[in-house]
Amino acid sequence: MPRCRWLSLILLTIPLALVARKDPKKNETGVLRKLKPVNASNANVKQCLWFAMQEYNKESEDKYVFLVVKTLQAQLQVTNLLEYLIDVEIARSDCRKPLSTNEICAIQENSKLKRKLSCSFLVGALPWNGEFTVMEKKCEDA
């Protein structure tokens, strides 16, 4: 009986693998499910946004850490990864880099230091493996 289950499982995954395989001509991964809205409170969305902000703050040359003010929308696309497109509003905080683990940050209130940005992050994830990659990042002044 277990042998039949394994055979069934293998036969079911073959079509999925064929659909998700890379097209060598286009060098793109097949889309299994196009972008669809997903709740911003979804655990995977939160993990992806946390990761994207860690990367943003690491790469940013700003002396201050940026925080998410508001999540505008989140969408999910399924390829060989779970791809989350997350639109957020971020702002400069009152915490300087590098951030210590026990520091509590608030949005910058000083008018000379205030700065808000609208950002879109495309994060590829295999959350069950703890794998996250910022595939695209676009930020502009809000």
Swiss-Prot record:
The keyword Transmembrane helix does not apply. Belongs to the cystatin family. The keyword Glycoprotein applies. Residues 1-21 form the signal peptide. It is found in: Secreted. GO terms for cellular component: cell surface; cytoplasm; extracellular region. Proximal caput region of the epididymis. Lower expression in the testis. Within the testis it is localized to the elongating spermatids, whereas within the epididymis it is exclusively synthesized by the proximal caput epithelium. The lineage of its organism: Eukaryota, Metazoa, Chordata, Craniata, Vertebrata. A motif (Secondary area of contact) lies at residues 77-81. Keywords: Disulfide bond, Glycoprotein, Protease inhibitor, Secreted, Signal, Thiol protease inhibitor. This is Cystatin-8. It holds the Pfam family Cystatin. Disulfide bonds join C95-C105, C119-C139. GO terms for molecular function: cysteine-type endopeptidase inhibitor activity. Performs a specialized role during sperm development and maturation.
